[in-house]
């Protein structure tokens, strides 16, 4: 009889242990939602004046984004050192997205590309993405298509500049007025892919010797390529028509297009298939 009681007691203890383990694993993990935004900033939504005095307004700025990821890294990832993000946790946004950065008015929020739910809490302090050729849609065959109008001294040029090269941007923590990527239990956080188009055209409102202007091509080199106020070029045609120096400047600026706020990114140009 005593032996039976002992066996039953052991069985009850085991059942209780299994029950406790089951309850702990079912709802104990803290999770939240992580959103991915793309932002061309006010330069794209409002227009601006290039370093060489052209007033530029954008109708559409299409970027095609794939392989989008946010990572938790410790120590923090440094894009000035390597392209490799050594992460503890990685959250990928599935799919491919063509985003119009010029969409919305002056006060428009950054564009929501997508979100991932039930991600582990923590600080996602690194972001990476690829700017790849779109297979269809308004950016078909290109990774970036810039459409707008440039005006100076009574001359007006409707332009389309298309980029067929592909780039991978690996970025550290967002730098701006607020920190991003901090996911808390039950809450929503966001990370941002930022694009600095003043790096291409420069900015008349900052000094000529500012790094933004010294590294930018401006718009003046494009103007002579217009025919009856119309300009439509891609990188291949621009390589043939621009001076070697201007073309190399353009190529360099495209590699610096991707940011996280004011935070920098490491850029790899992707091989063409």
Where are the regions a protein language model picked out?
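C-terminal motif of bacterial Sec signal peptides marking the signal peptidase cleavage site
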Residues: 19-22
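Bacterial N-terminal signal peptides that target proteins for export
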Residues: 1-10
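A short, solvent-exposed, low-complexity linear motif enriched for acidic/polar residues
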Residues: 24-273
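Core hydrophobic alpha-helical transmembrane segments of single-pass membrane proteins
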Residues: 12-15
């Amino acid at each position: 009889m005593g032996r039976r009681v002992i066996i039953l007691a052991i069985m009850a203890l085991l059942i209780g242990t299994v029950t406790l383990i089951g309850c702990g694993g079912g709802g104990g993990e803290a999770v939240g939602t992580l959103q991915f935004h793309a932002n061309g900033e006010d330069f794209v939504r409002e227009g601006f004046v290039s370093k060489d005095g052209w007033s530029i307004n954008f109708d559409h700025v299409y970027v095609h984004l794939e392989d989008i990821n946010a990572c938790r890294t410790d120590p923090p990832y440094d894009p000035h050192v390597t392209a490799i993000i050594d992460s503890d946790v990685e959250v990928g946004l599935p799919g491919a997205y063509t985003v119009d950065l010029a969409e919305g008015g002056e006060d428009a929020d950054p564009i929501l590309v997508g979100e991932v739910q039930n991600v582990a809490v923590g600080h996602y302090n690194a972001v990476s993405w690829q700017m790849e050729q779109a297979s269809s849609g308004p950016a078909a065959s290109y990774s970036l298509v810039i459409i707008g109008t440039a005006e100076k001294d009574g001359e007006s040029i409707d332009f389309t500049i298309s980029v067929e090269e592909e780039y991978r941007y690996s970025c550290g923590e967002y730098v701006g007025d607020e920190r991003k990527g901090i996911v808390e239990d039950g809450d929503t956080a966001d990370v941002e892919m930022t694009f600095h188009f003043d790096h291409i055209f420069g900015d008349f409102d900052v000094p000529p010797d500012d790094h933004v202007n010294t590294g930018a091509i401006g718009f003046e080199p494009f103007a002579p390529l217009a025919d009856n106020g119309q300009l439509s070029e891609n990188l291949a045609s621009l390589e043939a028509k621009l001076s070697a120096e201007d073309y190399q400047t353009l190529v360099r600026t495209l590699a610096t297009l991707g940011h996280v706020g004011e935070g920098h990114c490491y850029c790899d140009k992707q091989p063409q298939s």
